[in-house]
């Protein structure tokens, strides 16, 4: 994969950093897969004869439009934070880096990730933005990039079925890695359940 990143224009040292970061991110998020619900769930105190529980649940189908900067590291960090909470994803990889997209798809295909959970596409963002944002079966969209007019268009089209819209510009992507497990909550919904006691 380092050679592919070099073919796409990165220096060897930067390509090695990308691959090592991606491996670290896979391991990091794999560790959270069976822990994040215990960390973010809670029993709510109520003064009535009820139990009240709040637990994170997956949003559903999340479409992701990846950034051109640090293509592998950014794609893997967002991909892992989305699927670790039980979502499925349709990821539009950076149009200037299609080689690593295909290798990433092959890695996901040969791993234990169930078929259909991760769907990686390559293509032109301008052509696919409308479909990603307006499709009625998509529940959330993550836009990575600096083009504000593209995000506004995605936000407008997402209003048809009230998709959650998340924008991650380059500055936010840099901080994304420092948020730890809280990145998982971006595409999770908190569900509160009330249960009677002593009846």
Where are these regions (language model features)?
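Conserved small-residue-rich beta-alpha loop and adjacent elements
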Residues: 31, 36-114
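Conserved NAD(P)+-binding/catalytic subdomain of aldehyde/semialdehyde dehydrogenases
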Residues: 36, 46, 52, 56, ...
């Amino acid at each position: 994969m380092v050679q592919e990143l070099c073919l796409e224009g990165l220096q060897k040292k930067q390509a090695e950093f990308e691959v090592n970061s991606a491996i670290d991110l896979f391991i990091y998020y794999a560790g959270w897969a069976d822990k994040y619900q215990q960390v973010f769930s809670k029993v709510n105190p109520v003064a009535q004869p009820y139990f009240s529980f709040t637990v994170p649940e997956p949003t559903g189908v999340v479409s992701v439009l990846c950034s051109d900067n640090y293509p592998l590291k950014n794609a893997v960090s967002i991909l892992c934070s989305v699927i670790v909470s039980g979502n499925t994803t349709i990821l539009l990889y950076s149009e200037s880096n299609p080689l690593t997209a295909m290798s990433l798809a092959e890695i996901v295909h040969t791993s234990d990730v169930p078929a259909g959970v991760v769907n990686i596409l390559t293509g032109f963002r301008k052509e696919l933005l409308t479909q990603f944002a307006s499709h009625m079966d998509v529940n959330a969209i993550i836009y990575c990039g600096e083009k504000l007019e593209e995000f506004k268009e995605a936000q407008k089209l997402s209003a048809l079925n009230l998709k959650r819209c998340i924008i991650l510009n380059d500055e936010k992507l840099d901080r994304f890695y420092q948020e730890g497990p809280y990145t998982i909550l971006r595409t999770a919904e908190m569900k509160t359940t009330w249960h009677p006691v002593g009846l």
